[in-house]
Amino acid sequence: KEETIVTNQVRFEVKLLGATVFQVEGYSEEKYLKDQLISYNSKTLQNDKEKFVNLVFDKDRNKFDIKGSSYNGEASIDNIIGNWWSHKILQTNSQISPISGSIKQQIVTFVGKEKIDLYNKIYNVDHFTLKSKDISLPKDKRLDFDIWYDSKNFIIKKISYQRMGLWEYYL
């Protein structure tokens, strides 16, 4: 298959004692041509703040051109969009924020092989941590994730992090 399109739609809110403390609604689309990202577009409303990314691959310069709510400029094609569907996030030194377009340097560390139980099924996975390289970033801007990866099927099975409580994503 020549072209692949990945769409992502998210909408949720967190309420505490009836008051909304966090709210996100967004949509994104990634386009790949023969495994090369050629465009990424997203619009997100996060706590009433509009955020966006418009990224295109410049074939002549072999770079990404990014117009985002937090970053405008170019980026190396070694960057990966920081979405959880692609295991390539574990193989790069930096990622592009899927919400704002900012570029974040990261350190990925292999923790070990584990077995996890998801939906009453046991999976053999590799456990990694993914953290911001720049520890001077404010804590709420840092990358700090635990990731469980099924290397047999090339699928990230679970992600967890702490921010206003424990968040976990399962596939």
Model-derived regions: residue spans:
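Hydrophobic, well-structured mid-protein blocks that either form specific transmembrane helices
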Residues: 42-82
